Design a protein with these regions (language model features):
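Cytosolic/matrix-facing juxtamembrane and C-terminal tails of multi-pass cellular membrane proteins
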Residues: 169-206, 221
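Cytosolic-side membrane-entry/anchor segment at the start of a transmembrane helix
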Residues: 1-53, 120, 172-179
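Hydrophobic alpha-helical membrane-embedded segments
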Residues: 38-89, 164-168
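Hydrophobic alpha-helical transmembrane segments
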Residues: 41, 156-157
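Transmembrane alpha-helical segments and their cytosolic interface motifs
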Residues: 119-151
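Hydrophobic alpha-helical transmembrane segments of multi-pass integral membrane proteins
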Residues: 12-13, 45-49, 98-101, 130-140
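Membrane-proximal soluble regions of multi-pass membrane proteins
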Residues: 63-118, 122, 195
Length: 221
């Protein structure tokens, strides 16, 4: 609901602004009042469509192997994590909507934290989301090329900026969660390695014991 509220307020303010600047009122931008209002809704819808196209293209057209979480582009360092902590991401991240319900994979919680196969799927969704929100944040500036030039500063640029600030918080949250998930993933790997080593040692001990029993039996014979 937060994004809907932000977009609704932004569109309403821009519609009023461009209506006021139109020929029907102050005559600043050189378009009719009706066109000023219609162009506002057109630009907002265009930004939404650009975001939707990017999301659909990335998820449906690009190979999943491009979004492997261990690639450098998806790796989050300690310095980046500190940046997210400085902007108090923990206080507001839960107020930003999570779009997993549209993909069939909810990221609201980690259902199986000790299952790395599950975490791999979770990572894939994070990497998809990071890419989509990062590209969408800047692709929205295409609106500047697709709206009347006389409305560049009163409409196109504000819409592009609002679109950017609607995408960047989600991008930050996904990156922050990715750092924490990587720690969990590595801990699971270490635990699995310890268990494998323990099982290997147990098998070796059993083999030695079995060999000793056979040796005693052979000596008795």
């Amino acid at each position: 609901m937060l994004f809907v509220w932000v977009i609704s307020v932004a569109v309403t303010v821009l519609a009023i602004l461009n209506a006021a600047l139109s020929d029907g009122v102050f005559g600043v931008i050189g378009v009719s009042l009706g066109k000023g209002v219609l162009c506002t809704f057109y630009a907002a819808a265009l930004a939404v469509l650009i975001d939707a196209f990017i999301a659909l293209f990335i998820r449906r057209a690009l190979p999943a192997k491009w979004f492997y979480h261990k690639k450098a582009v998806f790796t989050v360092g300690a310095g980046e994590k500190k940046f997210y902590e400085r902007i108090k991401i923990r206080k507001w991240k839960d107020k930003i909507p999570e779009w997993g319900k549209f993909t069939g994979f909810s990221k609201n919680e980690i259902a199986r934290p000790q299952d790395n196969a599950y975490l791999e799927k979770y990572f894939l969704e994070l990497c998809y989301g990071e890419t989509i929100h990062f590209i969408s944040a800047y692709a929205g500036f295409a609106v500047l090329l697709l709206t009347p030039r006389v409305m560049l500063f009163s409409l196109a640029l504000p819409v592009a900026i609002v679109n950017m600030f609607c995408n960047l918080p989600s991008y930050f949250i996904l990156r922050y969660n990715s750092y924490k998930l990587e720690v969990l993933f590595k801990n699971n790997e270490k635990r699995a390695a310890r268990e494998a080593e323990k099982n290997s040692s147990a098998v070796a001990e059993n083999s030695v014991s079995f060999s000793s029993v056979n040796s005693v039996a052979d000596a008795a014979n």
